[in-house]
């Protein structure tokens, strides 16, 4: 069995549990993902499946990509990722994988690219408290001192300062699957996942045991 699949974030909504609790959920289009390459320990040194998801326009596909995808049916994909697998011999090129890898109540890890927020200050980027909001104050949203002048006479590497915020790979662990709608290739996860609407995601089996 593959350790994960690819998906797309469609947005957030809410569900009510049997006891009347409101549960915020993220709706994810999980597959169908196509097996574009099978890697084995004998040939490649490790066992893995290369999965493709999301159709890619022909005019955006170069010749090496076209030749690679011809082996699995010819269609090109926007997102291509590898997932570890224990038994690669059970899969074949062009095979489709979807929500059947997961079950309701199971907890999974979700990885994606966070929303881009441009150039941000220290309060938004790092959660600084800021200065006193007094009349005439000049340090309301400033970071304060960033180092000493006499020694070491420089800003220490790694100092939290204003800068570009977002567009980073983030992983959220132990998200519970609330519902699976196999006929629509949808998975409803409890809570939020990284990225904006239509962002590509990796849905993976737990790397660490969840409670």
Curated annotation (Swiss-Prot):
The SS bond pairs are none
Gene that codes for this? rplC
Q: What does this protein do?
A: One of the primary rRNA binding proteins, it binds directly near the 3'-end of the 23S rRNA, where it nucleates assembly of the 50S subunit.
Q: Which Gene3D superfamilies match?
A: 3.30.160.810, Translation factors
Q: Which family does it belong to?
A: Belongs to the universal ribosomal protein uL3 family.
Q: Which organism is it from?
A: Desulfatibacillum aliphaticivorans
Database matches in NCBIfam families:
L3_bact
The family database entries (Pfam families) matched by this protein are listed as: Ribosomal_L3
- One of the GO BP terms on file: translation
Q: Which GO terms describe its molecular function?
A: rRNA binding; structural constituent of ribosome
Name of the protein in question: Large ribosomal subunit protein uL3
- Which Gene Ontology cellular-component terms appear in the entry? cytosolic large ribosomal subunit
For this protein, the record's InterPro entries field holds:
Ribosomal_uL3 (IPR000597), Ribosomal_uL3_bac/org-type (IPR019927), Ribosomal_uL3_CS (IPR019926), Transl_B-barrel_sf (IPR009000)
Q: Which of UniProt's keywords are assigned here?
A: Ribonucleoprotein, Ribosomal protein, RNA-binding, rRNA-binding
Q: Subunit comment for this entry?
A: Part of the 50S ribosomal subunit. Forms a cluster with proteins L14 and L19.
